[in-house]
């Protein structure tokens, strides 16, 4: 299973995009198909709800409720201790703390705002994340070890 913390900007972009081929929409589709387990906590879920209900996005309550419910159905709730990291946007710290907590499980942080986080291999754009999720699985054979 691939674990990922999904930044709010990815969810908003997926819901307002007009392109069915948009990487942000495809990330959400992979989650809803059960190919990705999202990592959340109460603070992240509260931010999702607060941001998605902003009038400027024009999202219907039913759509918001459905998306939040589906995300929760494909999520693992993570209790993340403070890491002490300081980020340009203090509201991003919770996302970073959650991904750090699950790094031993190979978790990723998927964001449209790469520059808001420390440069590291596990902070990725939606396009990069799709490349990871959709990478073909390699089967190892005994001959692989014979060299």
Regions found by a protein language model. Give the residues of each.
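Acidic catalytic patch
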Residues: 42-45, 63-87
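Acidic, metal-coordinating catalytic cores used for nucleic-acid/nucleotide bond scission
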Residues: 85-91, 114-115
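Alpha-helix capping/helix-boundary segments
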Residues: 10-11, 44, 115-116
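Extreme N-terminal starter segment of soluble prokaryotic enzymes
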Residues: 1-3
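A secondary-structure boundary/capping signal
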Residues: 6-8, 40-41, 113, 125
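Acidic, metal-associated active-site segment
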Residues: 89-108
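Acidic, PIN/NYN-like endoribonuclease modules and their adjacent C-terminal/linker elements
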Residues: 104-108, 112-147
